[in-house]
Amino acid sequence: MAISSKEQETKKVKISVDKNPVDTSFEKWAQPGHFSRTLAKGPRTTTWIWNLHADAHDFDSQTSSLEEVSRKIFSAHFGQLSVIFLWLSGMYFHGARFSNYVAWLSNPTGIKPSAQVVWPIVGQEILNGDVGGGFQGVQVTSGWFQLWRASGITTEFQLYCTAIGGLAMAALMLFAGWFHYHKAAPKLEWFQNVESMMNHHLAGLLGLGCLGWTGHQIHLSLPINKLLDSGVSPQEIPLPHEFLINRELMAQLYPSFSKGLVPFFTLNWAEYSDFLTFKGGLNPVTGGLWLSDTAHHHLALAVLFLAAGHMYRTNWGIGHSMKEILEAHKGPFTGNGHEGLYEILTTSWHAQLAINLAMMGSLSIIVAHHMYAMPPYPYIATDYPTQLSLFTHHMWIGGFCIVGAGAHASIFMVRDYNPAENYNNLRSSSRHRDAIVSHLNWVCIFLGFHSFGLYIHNDTMRALGRSQDMFSDTAIQLQPIFAQWVQSIHTLAPGNTAPNALATASYAFGGDIVSVGNKVAMMPISLGTADFLVHHIHAFTIHVTVLILVKGFLFSRNSRLIPDKANLGFRFPCDGPGRGGTCQVSGWDHVFLGLFWMYNSLSVAIFHFSWKMQSDVWGSVSPSGNVSHITGGNFAQSAITINGWLRDFLWAQASQVIQSYGSALSAYGLIFLAAHFVWAFSLMFLFSGRGYWQELIESIVWAHNKIKVAPAIQPRALSITQGRAVGVAHYLLGGIGTTWAFFLARIISVG
């Protein structure tokens, strides 16, 4: 195939910057609202403070220059990284200064992790519970101790050094953010050079990042963990640098080290299989993945990403062009296919962000599930409070990211989308949006009525004493046969479809019970009718969330009801009376509604996880091998009715948080109570009439005028949108706080 001269042309990569584009001025920054002419004039009404918060980070509203917006985002990313390094440094510092890490390291099954000792001011020292080893403190459930163990950290001094390193990196990032905005700001074409960006992120960030971590794991983590696993005390283990410079020391633990790099260059790579393993399953000593497996995994990823980082065409005429790849995509029903997509993704950061948030959100939810099915760090599997916390945390993060994807998709549609440039291509999926939305709606109605209907049927039959007519494992069975089939093929894989694996990828699928310190780390998770029922509730709530978000961005520019919606903007309360309902139709309102359904989805998912694990996985193992689970396997019979969920999960397991007063867990009792109040407070904003408050304010202002203490800034009721924002924020904050206290008080007591 002949290549035209146009295709051979490559965009020469130039580092192009503007020198000193923006002055560094503390005087300017000290003025509230300096980024907006209107806000800089100062407050006339109380609405000013709301607009200040709403617009401070809305760079689109501050300038129409894409280059300037790009620079602000780029600079803000360095600020974000600085905060992350500061937070990391704080975590490591707490580990070094206030924790019982070294004691935990010598007895990880008998001592609980703690890195916070509460000062006695008026009796708060009650919160310092006995975590074992003579240490009194607040039990932490973050998983840091297990991560440090996997990294090969054995002393507080190492934690101190890392904390100082984190501070140095935070300062460097802060400087970089200032430098690349005020001293040398990249030009727009630098931000739009996607091939270079892909190559650098794939090869540098992911490829070299994985390679660096592999090196750390092989040279430091593996030998130190091998010695710890075999019972050597942390004090007797050689210092980390000795493993780096003393090959004999390494060769005692991993004989292939004595051969150096000869096997690598002679392609006898199998020689290295003593530290790059493919075992599968879990380390029976720690209940975590084999660290030699994870080193091998990261090495493989490094190779993949380093190769991927050489795929895109830059200064040399070889490799892919992103625009050509996209425009080659043409399906039978999508007209010009992906034509125009390259222009969208290089000129709309909202479109980019929407895709990235959806991907990262989904990835976070995948991480949540892998953390318990394949526990990656030593002793994390038997630390039930940490397992529950990490699952819940990653589910929440994922949910917020996915709703954020819907938000930025709508903002893209309203602010950045140009219909003239997107005729007859894939982006005109808005042409068949009615089919998409009505099908989703039908799916939601079907799933909702059928999944809920199965529970209602069971509740009714149980109330009538007709247990033989219920859907259950002992009466009318609804077994999840496809899930059970997936479990069985994974269990049978080692030696068959995965010929080199010694054990299954996860014992959740089947196989042995792995116990550490007489506690279950992981075991086969049997699925039955109760799981089948609740999985259809998951399907229902997830599809409703998707319906709201997808309808939101597909109709964010126009609809039959409001054809000129794009002119009204991303958020507006209503579009006047007289045409049916024109309130709650903006892109923003769909995000608002989507957040509630995201909360519904995740609550059911984390409740399902918490109860299922306590009922069917977590528990103690007797010397004879009998397992007694925390709630004695009650999930299969109790979780098949609404009443069972209310009585045997919510009510039965809330006893610990409700009765926590006067114990080390009493803070959770207070948080449980306070978070309920925060949640109830949200309802005042969600069921509110704006006019009611404005009338009330007028009366209060009249009274102030009467006694001549009227404020200079005129009080205003919250706008409808502001009220909804305050409402949903407190609803979610209250809900998350309540769940946090409920879960932790329970699992710290019984786990």
Curated annotation (Swiss-Prot):
The chain crosses the membrane at residues 73-96, 159-182, 198-222, 294-312, 349-372, 388-414, 435-457, 532-550, 590-611, 665-687, 725-745. It is a multi-pass membrane protein. Phylloquinone binds at residue 693. Pfam families: PsaA_PsaB (PF00223). P700 is a chlorophyll a/chlorophyll a' dimer, A0 is one or more chlorophyll a, A1 is one or both phylloquinones and FX is a shared 4Fe-4S iron-sulfur center. It is found in: Plastid, Chloroplast thylakoid membrane. GO terms for molecular function: 4 iron, 4 sulfur cluster binding; chlorophyll binding; electron transfer activity; magnesium ion binding; oxidoreductase activity. Chlorophyll a binds at residues 684, 692. Its main location: plastid. GO terms for biological process: photosynthesis. GO terms for cellular component: chloroplast thylakoid membrane; photosystem I. [4Fe-4S] cluster binds at residues 574, 583. The PsaA/B heterodimer binds the P700 chlorophyll special pair and subsequent electron acceptors. PSI consists of a core antenna complex that captures photons, and an electron transfer chain that converts photonic excitation into a charge separation. The eukaryotic PSI reaction center is composed of at least 11 subunits. Belongs to the PsaA/PsaB family. This is Photosystem I P700 chlorophyll a apoprotein A1. It comes from Pyropia yezoensis. The gene is psaA.
